[in-house]
From Swiss-Prot:
It comes from Actinobacillus pleuropneumoniae serotype 5b (strain L20). It catalyses: dihydroxyacetone phosphate = methylglyoxal + phosphate. Substrate binds at residues 19, 23, 45-48, 65-66, 98. This is Methylglyoxal synthase. Belongs to the methylglyoxal synthase family. Disulfide bonds: none annotated.
Amino acid sequence: MKTTIRKISARKSIALVAHDSCKQSLIQWTLQHKASLTPHTLYATGTTGHLLARESGLNIQALLSGPMGGDQQLGGLIAEKKIDILIFFWDPMNAAPHDPDVKALMRIATVWNIPVAINETSANFLLSAALFDQEIGINVPDYDGYLAERLA
């Protein structure tokens, strides 16, 4: 598929997600990085978002809970180019009833080429990257070209 360049502003839209067994770790991580996260627009799946907002005082737009459709809502926002970064503290040791939704979320994040952190260490690397607070361009699918080819 052909690609085009998508501009991501210095002020990012960041999705924060955590499986149940990882929620406290994400809360602690968010508290440690509150100053770095404050200038950005924050989204989260339902329970995680409400817990993060309560514990950190950050303004977080909480979507539905992951198993109730929140992962798919985030995937939709990624496809609409409204999410720039996904931080997902994922538990690889426990199956969740919405594992297919999680797989779909990861697939969409990969299709739209956004940075993804799946644990504390990768989130630390992402947050400390020189590009984190800069405007950048990323290659994304040329959906308009794709659609034009399909309709020709």
